């Protein structure tokens, strides 16, 4: 299996054992990576929800060890996506995830249904 990129929404769904999380097989998770922007986004949501920061980082590092640094290339790609994604209300975190997928030429997984309306040159898979 080739590399796949996970959005923060997928990470949160996995950690909270939400519907659709069962689609994240061991094989898929073994090839998964996440942008450091989305890693921070997921950690922030968990900590804001009352989780212990130390436990949050231990879980994220255990389940999602492959975090890709947000580079100038990713920044450029994320900025280029603004016009295409504005109507869908995608955040910087969303565009950062898509930028990583585009840079890696890898499929991306999200729980955000609006992403299926995008045509950014990489496959978009919905968790649910």
Residue ranges with predicted function:
Residues 42-47, 64:
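Helix-loop "lid/cap" segments that line or gate small-molecule binding pockets
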């Amino acid at each position: 299996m080739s590399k796949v990129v996970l959005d923060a929404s997928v990470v949160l769904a996995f950690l909270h054992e939400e519907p659709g999380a069962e689609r994240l097989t061991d094989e898929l998770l073994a090839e998964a990576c996440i942008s450091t922007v989305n890693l921070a986004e997921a950690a922030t949501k968990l900590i804001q929800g009352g989780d212990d920061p130390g436990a949050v980082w231990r879980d994220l590092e255990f389940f999602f060890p492959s975090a890709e640094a947000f580079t100038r290339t990713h920044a450029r790609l994320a900025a280029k996506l603004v016009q295409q994604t504005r109507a869908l209300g995608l955040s910087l975190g969303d565009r950062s995830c898509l930028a990583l997928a585009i840079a890696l030429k890898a499929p991306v997984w999200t729980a955000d249904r609006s992403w299926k309306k995008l045509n950014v040159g990489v496959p978009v898979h919905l968790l649910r």
